Design a protein with these regions (language model features):
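Non-catalytic structural scaffold of enzyme domains
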Residues: 1-135
Length: 135
């Protein structure tokens, strides 16, 4: 089995789908390192990132919501951010931290037009192993 890069697989999937602009949600460190942005730019895909206040709320969702196993979480800022990203032309939003899809599901945030890199990597691994993807 070849070594697979989740970021590369995610960006390649978006590129293959003709996506030209994406929103990117991730931890502070991932955003600051620019690992998604570099790969997206190399494929001609523009990135819409959270504002500073929105990013603080993304981090709160990850750490005070999902990791703390909080039973409830106010998702207003996250929902408004997704609307803003779409308004700014984002065709998809990458949930670039494994806790984000969990938080979206747990707290009822719509996953419409979101991309889970772990799902894309799993599908790529199945295909690389010579199997078909079942729906």
């Amino acid at each position: 089995m070849p070594v697979m890069n989740m970021i590369s697989e995610t960006v390649q999937s978006l590129y293959s789908d003709g996506v030209q602009r994406v929103g990117l949600l991730a931890t502070d460190g991932t955003l600051q390192a620019g690992v998604y942005q570099q790969e997206l730019t190399a494929h001609g895909i523009d990135t819409v990132c959270p504002t500073q206040a929105e990013q603080a709320e993304v981090m709160r969702l990850i750490y005070e919501g999902v990791k703390a196993d909080a039973p409830a979480f106010d998702t207003t800022v996250i929902a408004d951010m997704l609307v803003r990203m779409e308004r700014e032309g984002a065709q998809r939003v990458i949930l670039g931290c494994t806790e984000l899809p969990l938080g979206f599901d747990r707290y009822g945030i719509s996953r419409q037009n979101t991309v889970d890199p772990a799902d894309i990597l799993a599908q790529a691994a199945v295909l690389a192993a010579g199997y078909a993807i079942r729906n």
